[in-house]
Amino acid sequence: MPIGTPSVPYRLPGSQYERWVDIYTRLGVERILFLGQEVNDGIANSLVAQMLYLDSDDNTKPIYLYINSPGGSVTAGLAIYDTIKYVKSDVVTICVGLAASMGAFLLGAGTKGKRVALPHSRIMIHQPLGGTSQRQASDIEIEAREILRIKDMLNHSMSDMTGQSFEKIEKDTDRDYFLSAEEAKNYGLIDRVISHPSEAS
């Protein structure tokens, strides 16, 4: 039996009545966003819109982005990444569970000093995936060049995020490279391992 999105009571400011809203709407009021699935265009558009709204509402307060994601679409992930860098608000990234592939990239994209993970989080980095079906050789060649260009761009960005050399990032991401929360901190992908909400910002 599938579990639906939980609802919680919420009282609008100035109202004496509570109404039931879904948990993600309620968390959004507190500037808490959640990436808890594979990264795709739909979730990217939703997160981009929410970050832009929260930033325009009050860019002096941080936005909290909780991540428990196996990764997903590179182009969708880059839309989220660019928005994290675009908004004036600090973006606190918090790994709960797994941040793999594009999930790990977004974890590292948070505001420096405000990228954290819970103690039993797992982080995995690797090169972007690309596949071809039955297509013309010239199309396959074009796609391969684009994948290599994206790989190079992601590795340079990861190098900037972590302080690791481009060559080390290139070597480590050649295959799946798993890190514990503490290892991710030592690697420079996050800044702290936390066990209490007060440690997040």
From Swiss-Prot:
InterPro entries: ClpP, ClpP/crotonase-like_dom_sf, ClpP/TepA, ClpP_His_AS, ClpP_Ser_AS. It catalyses: Hydrolysis of proteins to small peptides in the presence of ATP and magnesium. alpha-casein is the usual test substrate. In the absence of ATP, only oligopeptides shorter than five residues are hydrolyzed (such as succinyl-Leu-Tyr-|-NHMec, and Leu-Tyr-Leu-|-Tyr-Trp, in which cleavage of the -Tyr-|-Leu- and -Tyr-|-Trp bonds also occurs). GO terms for biological process: protein quality control for misfolded or incompletely synthesized proteins. HAMAP family: ClpP (MF_00444). The gene is clpP2. Disulfide bonds: none annotated. It comes from Prochlorococcus marinus subsp. pastoris (strain CCMP1986 / NIES-2087 / MED4). It is found in: Cytoplasm. Keywords: Cytoplasm, Hydrolase, Protease, Serine protease. The active site is at 101 (nucleophile), 126. Belongs to the peptidase S14 family. Gene3D superfamilies: 2-enoyl-CoA Hydratase, Chain A, domain 1. Its main location: cytoplasm. GO terms for cellular component: cytoplasm; endopeptidase Clp complex. Cleaves peptides in various proteins in a process that requires ATP hydrolysis. Has a chymotrypsin-like activity. Plays a major role in the degradation of misfolded proteins. This is ATP-dependent Clp protease proteolytic subunit 2. Its EC number is 3.4.21.92. It holds the Pfam family CLP_protease. GO terms for molecular function: ATP-dependent peptidase activity; ATPase binding; serine-type endopeptidase activity. SUPFAM superfamilies: ClpP/crotonase. Fourteen ClpP subunits assemble into 2 heptameric rings which stack back to back to give a disk-like structure with a central cavity, resembling the structure of eukaryotic proteasomes.
